[in-house]
Regions:
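Extended charged/polar low-complexity repeat regions
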Residues: 1-177
Length: 177
């Protein structure tokens, strides 16, 4: 069950066991605090552009966020000094992320800005293949396993995983699964 205060600044959610989670919002309806039934909480703050500026998680770890001029996150920095960074291409697609431990993940795209590969920090690569209608038709993971998809129009009609298992999907006249 959900209950909202008259001003809209706070909402409570009660689960089937009667546990209450309280959500608090600022004047722009952004979540500023979440209080959980176990007594832990999260807090969030925002910069003047409206982006998430800082977050205190349930374990007490504080993270601050830095953005570029286009509103994309370029850095997450924890209170212990560990950072996670992000780089983007001119089309706005992420090209690299560096995790808190320094591991780098690279992302490549084709001329239509479709993701074609992800290379993880250990060098494992996942590749993505599309058809002429820009539909994802295959994903090959770092272990060489390929999952393939077939379509009827925009609807996936089958998916076959790397072990050869196939799932078939049917839709009604309104394209509902």
């Amino acid at each position: 069950a959900y209950e909202q205060t008259a001003g809209g600044g706070q909402t409570t959610a009660t689960d089937a066991e009667g546990n209450v989670t309280v959500y608090t919002y600022d004047d722009n309806y952004r979540t500023t605090k979440i209080e959980y039934p176990d007594g832990t909480f999260e807090e969030r703050s925002y910069n003047t552009a409206g982006y998430l500026a800082g977050r205190l998680d349930r374990t007490g770890v504080e993270t601050t966020y830095t953005y570029d001029g286009k509103g994309r996150v370029t850095q997450e920095k924890r209170q212990d000094g560990a950072t996670r960074t992000y780089a983007y291409n001119t089309a706005g697609k992420m090209t690299q992320s560096t995790d808190y431990d320094g591991g780098k993940t690279g992302y490549t795209y084709d001329g239509q800005n479709r993701l074609t590969s992800v290379t993880d920090a250990e060098g494992g690569q996942t590749s993505y293949t599309y058809d002429e209608k820009n539909r994802l038709v295959a994903v090959k993971d770092a272990n060489g396993n390929t999952t393939s998809y077939t379509y009827d129009g925009a609807c996936v009609t089958s998916m076959t995983d790397g072990a050869g298992n196939t799932w078939n999907y049917t839709y009604d006249a309104m394209n509902r699964l």
